[in-house]
Curated annotation (Swiss-Prot):
Keywords: Ribonucleoprotein, Ribosomal protein, RNA-binding, rRNA-binding. The keyword RNA-binding applies. The gene is rps7. This is Small ribosomal subunit protein uS7. One of the primary rRNA binding proteins, it binds directly to 16S rRNA where it nucleates assembly of the head domain of the 30S subunit. Is located at the subunit interface close to the decoding center. It comes from Methanosphaera stadtmanae (strain ATCC 43021 / DSM 3091 / JCM 11832 / MCB-3).
Length: 187
């Protein structure tokens, strides 16, 4: 028996093309993306949580949406519906493509030699790449929805569509490029 996400979209046909992210973008067949936090007690267990639920959890991070899972659920469901209507593609595939396109590969970290701090470029772990990508997407969507006539779902759908096309108007793509540019300058 095959389950469809929100009883609408089949996740078995979704592919992750970035080899580094394949083990960290979970595409399990579930109807309702809500694990009730079962993963929080085990390290790295969040990589086994559906990418759609992780997107919902990132939406709940802001102080205005803290703990409002039903609100995040409806925002994500409506955004996926808007993406499906605009592109006629599986919206989960569009989301995965957006995550791949906005996941930075390098960042800087601070080290101290002899009391002097230096910034050095380091590669980012795949788990952190997915986390940063989802954070950039949701932050861009929520910032554009604030004091705007467009709904949060519409802004999230727009951000995901722009990010999946690697459009420079996307907040997430801008943040990724900024992070990688800073890392390149630290070489």
């Amino acid at each position: 028996m095959s389950f469809k996400l929100f009883d609408k979209w089949d996740v078995t046909e979704v592919t992750v093309e970035d080899m580094g992210l394949q083990n960290y973008v979970c595409l399990d067949e579930i109807v309702v993306p809500h694990t009730m936090g079962r993963h929080v007690k085990r390290q790295f267990a969040k990589s086994k949580v559906s990418i759609v639920e992780r997107l919902m959890n990132k939406i709940m991070r802001t102080e205005r949406n803290s703990g409002k899972k039903n609100k995040a659920y409806s925002i994500v469901e409506d955004a996926l519906e808007i993406i499906n209507n605009k592109t006629k593609q599986n919206p989960v595939q569009v989301l995965v493509k957006a995550v791949e396109n906005t996941a930075p590969r390098e960042e800087t970290t601070r080290i101290k030699y002899g009391g002097i701090g230096y910034q050095i470029a380091v590669d980012i772990a795949p788990q952190r790449r997915v986390d940063l990508s989802l954070g950039f997407i949701t932050k861009g969507a929520m910032q554009s929805a604030f004091k705007n006539k467009k709904s949060a779902a519409q802004c999230l759908a727009d951000e995901i569509l722009l990010a999946s096309d690697e459009d420079s108007r996307s907040f997430a793509v801008q943040k990724k490029e900024e992070k990688e540019r800073v890392a390149r300058s630290a070489h």
